[in-house]
Amino acid sequence: MNRVEQDGLKIDAGLHRFLVEEAMPGTGVDPERFFSAFSDLIHDLGPKNRALLVKRDELQAKLDGWYRDHGAPVDMDAYEAFLKEIGYLLPEGSDFSVSTANVDPEIATIAGPQLVVPVMNARYALNAANARWGSLYDALYGTDAIPDAEGAERGKGYNPKRGGRVIAWARDFLDASAPLSSGRWIDATSLAIEGAALTVTLANGAKTALAMPAQFAGYSGNAAAPSEIVLRKNGLHVAIVLDPTTPIGKADAAGIADIILESAITTIMDCEDSVAAVDAEDKVLVYRNWLGLMKGDLEEQVAKGTTTFIRRLNPDRIYTASGGDKLTLPGRSLMLVRNVGHLMTNPAILDREGKEVPEGLMDAMVTALIALHDIGRNGRRANSRSGSMYVVKPKMHGPEEVAFACETFTRVEAALGLPANAMKMGIMDEERRTTVNLKECIRAARERVVFINTGFLDRTGDEIHTSMEAGAMIRKGDMKQAAWISAYENWNVDVGLECGLSGHAQIGKGMWAMPDLMAAMLEQKIAHPKAGANTAWVPSPTAATLHATHYHRINVSEIQNGLRSRSRAKLADILSVPVAARPNWTEEEIQRELDNNAQGILGYVVRWVDHGIGCSKVPDINNVGLMEDRATLRISAQHMANWLHHGIVSEAQIVETMKRMAAVVDAQNAGDPNYQPMASRFDESIAFQAALDLVLKGREQPNGYTEPVLHRRRLELKTKQRAA
């Protein structure tokens, strides 16, 4: 690897060239000053970063010892006293309210879906950014949200019966979201603007209006025959597209060709769990796509059938407001960026001692440099109109680590000439020590926090690893019914509201991991806004459009106001450890648990290691496609490691299961010409060996994280490929 030495840093030449020739021009940043400040950041804060990781290990060792002596806690008072004694559970200070300023309404006041996408993949990133608006007709027609039964099957051509059910569903949605003062939307025959109001003519010839006229936001085209009508509910917009020249519009009595919903209000462009970025080559790709998003010039050639086209960021949507003025609605999702956490280092840059630098420090400096194209002195203000950069920080353990992230942001702001607190922080509440100290974590970032989120997947992985020595854990599928998890979900909302996040920040809920099961999502995920969350994660733009309907039905602000008087969830419930009271499962139940975990691990790891794909839809043992990333991998690997440690299964049984399920995964990937089977070459397959490492060496992984094994094995494969 060629390196450029500058200010005590040894920087990969490709990364250095990217920074100087691509990222810096147009920002007003002087390269000499940038690298000097970057070096100071690395050498001043690197030792602090490493010390925080040592503290994690020290606390884990004390927990391991306690559990070996006592097992799962029964006397919760004694257990809490121990956690306080070792500095795991910290004193809670006085009440306060966050004071985060200059927050865009998409985060502060608008409730709606949130996408998380690997920024390493330009097509996914563009699709997500453009998912601010989505066709309700397409989302319903193309998914199981509309049943295939009784002649309404999806096929290659248009099925009018299915289309009729889509239209009926959408009209029912309009009746609920923007009811008419009389009549129903299904009976509309024409729409027009008269004065500053929307007039709807019904099939019986009667004219009606909106029951709440203020819901009419604007239109495009001619007032007497508009091409679009824009309505508003709970801060979200709906565009009714009128076009009788299209097949759908021609068959519709009112000429309605589609209903477009404001969908993914925010999107996290992810540099972390959904990407596989292990070296400078990978990091440059991550940063280059983020640069394209911030400059607005990211594009990707997309092939559909025999045609190709260029996908770019969508422009804003321009309308005439109800009062006659110009109405501009954002055409793109507000973008946050998720940096990596405090754990990993990256060989892209070495410090003056030759050590790999903490990747979180590198991400902070470089992603903020790139964000200057949007929020700097010469910035476009096309993403954040409020001049803020939104950084999600994952996998932090407690307030000391949050404070360290804040210190990092302060240093980066000074280096880049940004105003104080321009870098906002999203706190992933996905580690147990952060959960139990959440109020103090928020206090540490009270001038920056714009987001807290329950990442129940990683949080479950940490739950298992933290209490690894306490006993055999309950089955993975039973975790969602465990006492700790419901208390954790409620605690996050309770503490967030106590700290004044409402109106300043998002209180988020986790991912719907089954992208093909949209009917189930429509039925179940409404629970998230009902629980007081003003955002929740969805796996696709289509899912965002369907989930957006929930925020029309539920006024989250009203829900949050009602929850303020609720007693906070019980700490004792959160601290309860999900060990099996009587681990008396049958051999068949144990083997099925192993098979399911092994298949998920192998299906994800083989794509991560062999192809550098960090987020995959992996079929489970029942052939249901599940979105897998490092968080789901962490659960499965830690669960198998726990059962191995406590003698529920043997190492030989795990190896046999892995080998057998490798053949299943191979068969599921048989249609991929680039896929390398594992089953015929267990010893040679680096991916298979990585999967074994994650389980057989699961107890020794720091906090149960999968990154060290994945990075090492991916680098091993890349080195092997270069040598071939």
Curated annotation (Swiss-Prot):
One of its GO terms (biological process) is glyoxylate catabolic process. It comes from the Bacteria. Keywords: Cytoplasm, Glyoxylate bypass, Magnesium, Metal-binding, Oxidation, Transferase, Tricarboxylic acid cycle. Acetyl-CoA binds at V116, R123, Y124, S274, R311, P539. Pathway: Carbohydrate metabolism; glyoxylate cycle; (S)-malate from isocitrate: step 2/2. One of its GO terms (molecular function) is malate synthase activity. Glyoxylate binds at R338, E430, G455, F456, L457, D458. The keyword Iron-sulfur does not apply. The modification Cysteine sulfenic acid (-SOH) is found at C615. Disulfide bonds: none annotated. It is found in: Cytoplasm. Monomer. Involved in the glycolate utilization. Catalyzes the condensation and subsequent hydrolysis of acetyl-coenzyme A (acetyl-CoA) and glyoxylate to form malate and CoA. This is Malate synthase G. It comes from Sinorhizobium medicae (strain WSM419) (Ensifer medicae). The gene is glcB.
